[in-house]
């Protein structure tokens, strides 16, 4: 018997994977979205969180970008 689960395959570098795993761990148990951690750079997540992950990564990158100070 085969069990099929609909989800989204996420491929990213190791720091982004850790960021997504940390997001998942900070959620209450009923809202956890990672179905399976495939390896250090690939995750299988529930399809309804794709946009939330994209937004969180975008915000994270904006916060970590360097802006040259104006003198």
Curated annotation (Swiss-Prot):
Record's keyword terms, sorted: DNA damage, DNA repair, Nucleus, Transcription, Transcription regulation
A GO biological process held by the record: nucleotide-excision repair
SMART domains the UniProt entry points to: Tbf5
Places the protein is found: Nucleus
Pfam families reported for this sequence: Tfb5
InterPro entries: TFB5-like_sf, TFIIH_TTDA/Tfb5
GO cellular component, one term: transcription factor TFIIH core complex
Record family assignment: Belongs to the TFB5 family.
Record's subunit section: Component of the 7-subunit TFIIH core complex composed of XPB, XPD, TFB1/GTF2H1, GTF2H2/P44, TFB4/GTF2H3, TFB2/GTF2H4 and TFB5/GTF2H5, which is active in NER. The core complex associates with the 3-subunit CDK-activating kinase (CAK) module composed of CYCH1/cyclin H1, CDKD and MAT1/At4g30820 to form the 10-subunit holoenzyme (holo-TFIIH) active in transcription.
Function: Component of the general transcription and DNA repair factor IIH (TFIIH) core complex, which is involved in general and transcription-coupled nucleotide excision repair (NER) of damaged DNA and, when complexed to CAK, in RNA transcription by RNA polymerase II. In NER, TFIIH acts by opening DNA around the lesion to allow the excision of the damaged oligonucleotide and its replacement by a new DNA fragment. In transcription, TFIIH has an essential role in transcription initiation.
This protein's name: General transcription and DNA repair factor IIH subunit TFB5
Species annotation: Arabidopsis thaliana
């Amino acid at each position: 018997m085969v069990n099929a689960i609909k989800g989204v395959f996420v491929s990213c570098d190791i720091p982004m994977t850790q960021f997504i795993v940390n997001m998942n761990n900070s959620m209450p148990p009923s809202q956890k979205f990672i179905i399976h951690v495939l390896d250090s750079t690939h995750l299988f997540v529930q399809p309804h969180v794709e946009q939330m992950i994209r937004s969180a990564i975008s915000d994270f990158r904006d916060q970590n970008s360097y802006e040259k100070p104006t003198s």
